[in-house]
Amino acid sequence: MSKTHLTEQKFSDFALHPVVVQALEKKGFYNCTPIQALALPLTLAGRDVAGQAQTGTGKTMAFLTSTFHYLLSHPAAENRQVNQPRALIMAPTRELAVQIHSDAEPLAEATGIKLGLAYGGDGYDKQLKVLESGVDILIGTTGRLIDYTKQNHVNLGAIQVVVLDEADRMYDLGFIKDIRWLFRRMPAATERLNMLFSATLSYRVRELAFEQMNNAEYVEVEPEQKTGHRIKEELFYPSNEEKMRLLQTLIEEEWPDRAIIFANTKHRCEDIWGHLAADGHRVGLLTGDVAQKKRLRILDEFTRGDLDILVATDVAARGLHIPAVTHVFNYDLPDDCEDYVHRIGRTGRAGASGHSISLACEEYALNLPAIETYIGHSIPVSKYNPDALLSELPPPKRLSRPRTGNGPRRSGAPRNRRRTG
């Protein structure tokens, strides 16, 4: 994490449980990010927090630190049953739930607090086996949480801490009824610590906070700035016929260390993946059709640097902290203005600079005015020479083979091809 992204406030300055501070410092966390410095004084005082912060600002560690401190500082109910977790952390996607669980593991190891994970797709019996042994903090997606609760594998009657992460995304994915169902089975809001985090504190998110929290305090990090000032934005107007060649040319010119390419449909993502894999790039595909285990493996490979490019639908645009993404390509301009902000928010994180390149083609250029109105500025336009685009590119690979993840490794030697003109 860049030092420019940190405040002068140290975790050790707060009255945090000493074991929590030691665990944080062991992981190299000494100074707070802005959202942590704003949220911790409130949660340590037992006050509910609704925070506006993008992914990558340290919000996960803000609510994890608060949760572990609270559980260590407040005894569990004497009559608590083995199927009753003490804290519940709800996430909109299984990838985010897995990531939060991973971030919580060092704190759990240091404190002896037990973690559980519940998400759909696979691993039902494996997850259930952990729950049956008893967990203190349960992290999961709403569908699987409801499933376990209805079967009495989980009872929410002893919940002391609740976290709702990416609340706006919960609405986008239609999970709000599930959230309310789960809240109705918990103790009253006044009897627990409640935290909500969202990229935007829209009216509907504030309404949820009013309904389910106890006079929540609102904290915001740079609320006036919808796109990071460290992100260089750039816009091209390609024809539909030249769009793919322009993308491949830009990748050759930029040669990004780590890039994410977003498209609006899974079929478009598969097409992009096929062209880039055939062209020799180390590229992974992340859509809803990719099996859960493979999605997690691809994310891990991309995070480790074994893949240079990830092609994704908006399933990956929210909540996933992938460090050091240098470039984001919007192959399609998104239909939802907020998705533009969330997509380009993959880069320029934690004090680093980033580059966002958008292609406004004939099909999606109509989305541009609403996006620019939403972000409050025009995206700088760049021009390209059609005669300078790459040509003689290989035909795209197809997804007939099981391996969805990677194309061939990049070679340091240039391929024998030429630009036209």
UniProtKB/Swiss-Prot annotation:
Domain Helicase C-terminal: 245-390
Chief location bin: cytoplasm
MF (Gene Ontology): ATP binding; ATP hydrolysis activity; RNA binding; RNA helicase activity
SUPFAM superfamilies per record: P-loop containing nucleoside triphosphate hydrolases (SSF52540)
Bias kind Low complexity: ranges: 405-414
PROSITE patterns associated with the record: DEAD_ATP_HELICASE, HELICASE_ATP_BIND_1, HELICASE_CTER, Q_MOTIF
Spans annotated as Disordered: 390-421
Subcellular localization, as worded in the UniProt entry: Cytoplasm
Biological role: DEAD-box RNA helicase involved in RNA degradation. Has RNA-dependent ATPase activity and unwinds double-stranded RNA.
Protein name as it appears in the record: ATP-dependent RNA helicase RhlB
Organism (species): Cronobacter sakazakii (strain ATCC BAA-894) (Enterobacter sakazakii)
